[in-house]
């Protein structure tokens, strides 16, 4: 959190004498409670002290807890890793009103998602998600309950099952082909000096992700391409709404951390912006839903919204509105799919450009399997073992989110410690996946590790040393869809083009600060040179 900004907000905002007095009273009460609680970390049994609570980070401020530690500019996952070196793999912190258990040990994480999986099945929401994303109706944030289990069943059996993914394969590949045709056209552009124009692959990955996701969820053809070209005002408006959602949801709000001071959020205007953006997003989703209601699609051409409409009448919604249930589920699929695949593909290619040996190995594997007389197809992907290792290794070093958050409503025991109900769980995935006790040369990019000693480890949430898609009941239901898409795009790109960085320099691997997703902070500009016959880059849409 940018704590200096928070302090400036407090200093620059007029606070009434009544509010200040209430705040001082709260500080006194807080100090009394902290003094009392800090003296009861252990219990005794026949003269022996038995630790009942995990170590607590010292230096908490009244009301704000340890939020001031996030004001140094250091990335949260790195700061938490340093604290783990001091306090151990499990310790507690205070983030405003929230007591949080921070974990970075594979054994403890496994216990949380096996023995205590039901207890840690809730994902904390924020005021931003509440106002903009139907959080109480969404599979992403609705509490663990019969309604959530119904949503999960629909996602895994109706929307993202192997049969459904097979039925939409043609939609997916056709959208990918459209984007590759556009990419080929871009490679033919020259600047005023006749030199090739660099292409921002980060932006292109966003386009192809939008193309595929919007086609399979809403039936919108070439949607990402229309956004880039500005040909469709609805597409441009939608992109603007989603970009604003991403920006607003990355903000730290006092309402989430210190509810007593939540009224200060109104002075910044962010709450009004969230409400406005939520209304605009709901309006466009409702419009698309009405369009789907008025048309009929054959089973072979059904998109996800069609499927949701067809099953909603027979679904137990436990009092939730039918239209909201459909919109919330589709939006969760968008949020879980578009940004995450663009981010993952960007990191994969960035690491390959800085590790040319791995890039050449991947290309040799594809050339040997596919040759140069055709494009890579979906059916080829399962045989690209080195490509699979590259994706795993990238997700180990750069998972979609460095931190994974859950909470519990009931008391439980974790690693011998008593954890009170209401405690949040924060897993430092970044440290977990770079643990030298688990990984050889953990800071190095070595895809070969997944062909040898770590060959049996996958990313599906069953191996707790590698959790890019989460684990437990809340593991991402779209793992198979995401991997199929990423394999195809990456394989076609490596197979179809020789790639060079500008001036032969390494790619900048700096990470953007803030937000919920681990985003590369700079563009990925490369010079692409086609290496196949021109006819192979053409496509029929």
From Swiss-Prot:
Which cofactors? heme
The molecular function GO annotations come to: heme binding; iron ion binding; protopine 6-monooxygenase activity
An individual GO BP term? isoquinoline alkaloid biosynthetic process
Coiled-coil spans in chain: none
* The protein's annotated pathway: Alkaloid biosynthesis
What residue ranges are annotated as transmembrane?
Answer: 9-29
- Name the EC number(s): 1.14.14.98
Q: Which domain of life is it from?
A: Eukaryota
Which sites bind heme? 476
The membrane topology term of the UniProt record is:
Single-pass membrane protein
Catalyses which reaction(s): protopine + reduced [NADPH--hemoprotein reductase] + O2 = 6-hydroxyprotopine + oxidized [NADPH--hemoprotein reductase] + H2O + H(+)
Task: List locations, semicolon-separated.
Answer: Endoplasmic reticulum membrane
* UniProt key word Metal-binding: yes
The answer, when asked if Secreted is one of the entry's keywords, is no
Judged by the first EC level, this protein's enzyme class is oxidoreductase
Q: Which cellular component appears as one GO term in the record?
A: endoplasmic reticulum membrane
Q: Could you tell me the keywords of this UniProt record?
A: Endoplasmic reticulum, Heme, Iron, Membrane, Metal-binding, Monooxygenase, Oxidoreductase, Transmembrane, Transmembrane helix
Q: What is its main location?
A: endoplasmic reticulum
What functional role does this protein have? Catalyzes the conversion of protopine and allocryptopine to dihydrosanguinarine and dihydrochelerythrine, respectively, in the biosynthesis of isoquinoline alkaloid sanguinarine.
> Which family is this sequence assigned to?
Belongs to the cytochrome P450 family.
Q: What is this protein called?
A: Protopine 6-monooxygenase
Which species does this protein come from? Papaver somniferum (Opium poppy)
Q: What is the lineage of its organism?
A: Eukaryota, Viridiplantae, Streptophyta, Embryophyta, Tracheophyta
Query: What gene is behind this protein?
Result: CYP82N3
């Amino acid at each position: 959190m940018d704590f200096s900004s928070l302090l400036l907000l407090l200093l620059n905002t007029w606070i009434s004498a009544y509010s200040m007095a209430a705040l001082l009273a709260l500080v006194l009460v807080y100090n009394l409670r902290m003094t009392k609680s800090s003296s009861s970390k252990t219990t005794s049994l026949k003269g022996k002290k038995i630790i009942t609570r995990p170590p607590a980070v010292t230096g908490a401020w009244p009301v704000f807890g340890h939020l001031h530690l996030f004001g140094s500019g250091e990335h949260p996952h790195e700061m938490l890793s340093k604290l783990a070196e001091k306090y151990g793999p499990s310790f507690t912190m205070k983030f405003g009103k929230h007591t949080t258990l921070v974990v970075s040990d594979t054994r403890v994480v496994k216990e949380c998602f096996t023995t205590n999986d039901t207890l840690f099945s809730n994902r904390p929401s924020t005021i931003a998600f509440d106002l903009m994303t139907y959080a109480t109706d969404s599979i992403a944030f609705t509490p663990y309950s019969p309604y959530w289990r119904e949503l999960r069943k629909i996602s895994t059996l109706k929307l993202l099952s192997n049969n459904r993914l097979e039925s939409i394969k043609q939609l997916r590949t056709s959208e990918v082909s459209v984007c590759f045709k556009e990419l080929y056209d871009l490679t033919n552009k020259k600047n005023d000096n006749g030199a090739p124009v660099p292409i921002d692959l980060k932006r292109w990955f966003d386009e192809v992700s939008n193309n595929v996701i919007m086609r399979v969820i809403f039936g919108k053809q070439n949607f990402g391409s229309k956004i880039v070209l500005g040909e469709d005002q609805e597409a441009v408006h939608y992109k603007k709404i989603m970009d604003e959602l991403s920006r607003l949801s990355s903000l730290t709000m006092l309402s989430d951390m210190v509810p007593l001071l939540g009224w200060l959020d109104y002075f910044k205007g962010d709450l009004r912006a969230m409400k406005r953006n939520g209304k605009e997003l709901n309006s466009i989703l409702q419009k698309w839903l009405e369009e789907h209601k008025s048309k009929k699609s054959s089973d072979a051409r059904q998109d996800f919204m069609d499927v949701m409409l067809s099953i909603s009448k027979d679904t137990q919604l436990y009092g939730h509105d039918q239209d909201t249930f459909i919109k919330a589920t589709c939006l969760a699929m968008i949020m879980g799919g578009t940004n995450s695949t663009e981010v993952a593909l960007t990191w994969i290619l960035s690491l390959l450009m800085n590790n040319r040996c791995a890039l050449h190995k991947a290309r040799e594997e594809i050339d040997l399997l596919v040759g140069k007389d055709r494009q890579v197809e979906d059916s080829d992907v399962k045989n690209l073992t080195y490509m699979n290792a590259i994706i795993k290794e990238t997700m180990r070093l750069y998972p979609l989110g460095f931190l994974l958050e859950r909470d519990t409503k009931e008391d439980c025991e974790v690693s011998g410690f008593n954890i009170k109900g209401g405690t949040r769980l924060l897993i430092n995935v970044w440290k977990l996946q770079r643990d030298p006790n688990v990984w050889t040369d953990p800071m190095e990019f070595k895809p070969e590790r997944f062909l040898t000693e770590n060959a049996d480890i996958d990313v599906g949430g069953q191996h707790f040393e590698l959790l890019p898609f989460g684990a437990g009941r809340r593991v991402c239901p779209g793992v198979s869809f995401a991997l199929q898409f990423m394999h195809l795009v990456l394989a076609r790109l490596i197979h179809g083009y020789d790639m060079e960085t500008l001036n032969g320099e390494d790619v900048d691997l700096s990470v953007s600060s803030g937000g919920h997703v681990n985003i590369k902070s700079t563009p990925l500009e490369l010079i692409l040179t086609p290496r196949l016959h021109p006819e192979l880059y053409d496509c029929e849409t």
